[in-house]
């Protein structure tokens, strides 16, 4: 059964992951973010609805 033979597919998978992790990933991580992430801790309490019949 050829689909169970891992010889070509395993090497292709390893080559793909090494290419991604060594060449593409550092180039993607070198970009600067346009908006700096900020902590959003502000919590607002909802205003209760005033029912006209109570």
Curated annotation (Swiss-Prot):
GO terms for cellular component: mitochondrial membrane; proton-transporting ATP synthase complex. The chain crosses the membrane at residues 8-24. GO terms for molecular function: proton transmembrane transporter activity. Keywords: ATP synthesis, CF(0), Hydrogen ion transport, Ion transport, Membrane, Mitochondrion, Transmembrane, Transmembrane helix, Transport. It is found in: Mitochondrion membrane. It is a single-pass membrane protein. One of its GO terms (biological process) is proton motive force-driven ATP synthesis. Its main location: mitochondrion. Belongs to the ATPase protein 8 family. Component of the ATP synthase complex composed at least of ATP5F1A/subunit alpha, ATP5F1B/subunit beta, ATP5MC1/subunit c (homooctomer), MT-ATP6/subunit a, MT-ATP8/subunit 8, ATP5ME/subunit e, ATP5MF/subunit f, ATP5MG/subunit g, ATP5MK/subunit k, ATP5MJ/subunit j, ATP5F1C/subunit gamma, ATP5F1D/subunit delta, ATP5F1E/subunit epsilon, ATP5PF/subunit F6, ATP5PB/subunit b, ATP5PD/subunit d, ATP5PO/subunit OSCP. Subunit 8, of the mitochondrial membrane ATP synthase complex (F(1)F(0) ATP synthase or Complex V) that produces ATP from ADP in the presence of a proton gradient across the membrane which is generated by electron transport complexes of the respiratory chain. ATP synthase complex consist of a soluble F(1) head domain - the catalytic core - and a membrane F(1) domain - the membrane proton channel. These two domains are linked by a central stalk rotating inside the F(1) region and a stationary peripheral stalk. This is ATP synthase F(0) complex subunit 8. It comes from Gallus gallus (Chicken).
